[in-house]
Amino acid sequence: MAHLLIVNADDFGLSRGQNYGIVECHRHGIVTSTTALVNAEGIEHAAQLCKELPHLGVGLHFTLTMGQPLSPIPSLTRNGVLGKWLWQMAEQEQLPLDEIRVELNAQYQRFVELFGCPPDHIDSHHHVHMFKQIFPIVAEFAQQKALPIRVDRLLAQKENLNTQGVISSDGFDSQFYGDEISQALFLKTLDDAKARGEQSLEVMTHPAFIDNPLRVSGYCFQRLTELEVLTQSSLKQAIAERGYQLGTYQDLI
């Protein structure tokens, strides 16, 4: 039986360069799935591109750390925007959980308006849905909508998160990130998953063509390196040789 490999490109909608990079890796590479930032400046462009990509799984990249929220959530914003102070609020047990529920629903509804259908699955920008206070909210919401979510199993075990009833891949790997991007690194994620006995795996990626909005990102030109690796023809063959079949989160349902 083939192992399922979901290659997800985060940050769909972040910019046109990000969008074009993800599309390139879907059409000419191994990206099968992406997750959309519905409050980002390039999201309408992303939704337009998707009309010609029927086989690309598109999920919701829930964000509480970037841009303007889609609902009135004053406790989470400063000067009207979201930011990384969320970590400090979480550490101090000061997260406004009711506001987070409202914003999650607002971003979900915005996704449906933009793409004309529910998301393929749910994950989050900067992995905020794996915070111990936020995970139960996202998990319950996803179960109500019968949607899969990304689960970092190691982090879930560390934080003692209840994943019962959650639809997700057996494994999740975020190693394909940073300054040492290569085909060998990508294939290592597959070999590691097999060694752990996982039948399904999601690998997180961030491929992009670089444009001006991305130049201010702390993770910029590495995105272009990811694109180059993910579109190498030899990579698809190496994946097949390891017994993996490319798919999306919908293949788990």
Swiss-Prot record:
Q: Where in the cell is it found?
A: Cytoplasm
Q: What metabolic or biological pathway is this protein involved in? A: Glycan degradation; chitin degradation
Instruction: Please give the InterPro entries that the UniProt record associates with this protein.
Output: COD_ChbG_bac, Glyco_hydro/deAcase_b/a-brl, YdjC-like
Q: Name one Pfam family in it.
A: YdjC
Binding-site list for Mg(2+):
61, 125
This enzyme's EC code(s)? 3.5.1.105
Kindly state which reaction or reactions the protein catalyses. N,N'-diacetylchitobiose + H2O = N-acetyl-beta-D-glucosaminyl-(1->4)-D-glucosamine + acetate; diacetylchitobiose-6'-phosphate + H2O = N'-monoacetylchitobiose-6'-phosphate + acetate
Keywords of this protein's UniProt record, alphabetized? Carbohydrate metabolism, Chitin degradation, Cytoplasm, Hydrolase, Magnesium, Metal-binding, Polysaccharide degradation
GO cellular component, alphabetical, reads: cytoplasm
Reading the lineage from the top rank, the first entry is Bacteria
Q: Name one GO molecular function term.
A: chitin disaccharide deacetylase activity
Question: Cofactors per UniProt?
Answer: Mg(2+)
Functionally, this protein is described as follows:
Involved in the degradation of chitin. ChbG is essential for growth on the acetylated chitooligosaccharides chitobiose and chitotriose but is dispensable for growth on cellobiose and chitosan dimer, the deacetylated form of chitobiose. Deacetylation of chitobiose-6-P and chitotriose-6-P is necessary for both the activation of the chb promoter by the regulatory protein ChbR and the hydrolysis of phosphorylated beta-glucosides by the phospho-beta-glucosidase ChbF.
How the protein assembles, per its UniProt entry?
Homodimer.
PANTHER family, per the entry? CARBOHYDRATE DEACETYLASE, YDJC DEACETYLASE FAMILY MEMBER
Matching entries from NCBIfam families are given as: PRK02134.1
What the record says about family reads:
Belongs to the YdjC deacetylase family. ChbG subfamily.
Q: What is this protein called?
A: Chitooligosaccharide deacetylase
This protein's species is: Proteus mirabilis (strain HI4320)
The upper taxonomy is: Bacteria, Pseudomonadati, Pseudomonadota, Gammaproteobacteria, Enterobacterales
